[in-house]
């Protein structure tokens, strides 16, 4: 399964646009959410990455099967004699997702039979939190004064933001500037720069210096 916003979806979206189709439907299901949470935890991801899979995106991707688990979908297909195609790579344990699916989660279910439900609820709760942060970030963007001619932002405006909101603002600005991924350590250094003026500067992507 591809991640939301994955480049793998671009050819499908382009094909849909050429044929004036309203959306592209993918086969993501409830198990994909649980697997995704475990994978992100193993990678040390933060709340945004743990927030699960959206039922629909602004790009035109819809995921109508998210309410159901894979066994439920397969049972329905068999009952209605509808054939389906299995991706042969789904059995390859060389992929992290497959190790989570075939090894990690089955072992977790031995101790916690409802682990899938717990993981999905966690993802849903974090998604709700992220939606709230997104709304607050939009409001903050309205009162944070514009970039100065030298590319700066008034320090007092950034100091007024709580850290969780400021982190998201910094990451959004980095993405807008084409800086790319900002690590957790870099984010912490940026907070210290804003709050304590120490360090005096932080370098991102080897060429962007914030001070």
Task: Identify what each model region corresponds to.
Residues 1-14, 47:
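ATP-dependent adenylate-handling ligase core
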Residues 3, 63-64, 161, 181:
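Residue-level marker of alpha-helix boundaries and capping positions
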Residues 3-7, 99, 161-165:
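A generic alpha-helix signature
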Residues 8, 18-27, 31-126, 134, ...:
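Catalytic subdomain that performs nucleotidyl-dependent activation
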Residues 11, 76, 169-173:
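Amphipathic alpha-helical segments that form well-ordered structural scaffolds
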Residues 15, 108, 173-174:
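Broad structural signal for hydrophobic residues in well-ordered alpha-helices, predominantly aliphatic
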Residues 42, 55-58, 102, 120-211:
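AMP-forming adenylation/ATP pyrophosphatase catalytic core
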């Amino acid at each position: 399964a591809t991640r939301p916003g994955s480049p793998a979806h671009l050819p499908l979206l382009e094909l849909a646009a050429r044929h004036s189709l309203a959306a592209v439907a993918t086969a993501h299901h409830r198990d994909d959410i649980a697997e995704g949470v475990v994978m992100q935890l193993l990678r040390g991801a933060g709340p945004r990455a743990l927030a699960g899979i959206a039922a629909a995106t602004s790009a035109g991707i819809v995921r109508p099967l998210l309410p159901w688990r894979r066994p439920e979908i397969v049972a329905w297909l068999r009952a209605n004699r509808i054939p389906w195609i299995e991706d042969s790579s789904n059995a390859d344990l060389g992929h992290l997702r497959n190790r989570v699916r075939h090894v990690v989660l089955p072992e977790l279910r031995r101790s916690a039979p409802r682990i899938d439900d717990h993981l999905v609820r966690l993802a849903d709760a974090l998604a709700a939190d992220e939606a709230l942060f997104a709304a607050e970030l939009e409001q903050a963007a309205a009162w944070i004064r514009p970039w100065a001619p030298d590319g700066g932002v008034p320090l007092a405006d950034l100091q007024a933001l709580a850290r969780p909101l400021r982190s998201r603002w910094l990451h959004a600005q980095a993405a807008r500037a084409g800086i790319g991924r900002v690590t957790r350590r870099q984010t912490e250094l940026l907070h210290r720069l804003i709050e304590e003026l120490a360090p005096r500067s932080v370098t991102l992507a080897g060429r962007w210096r914030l001070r």
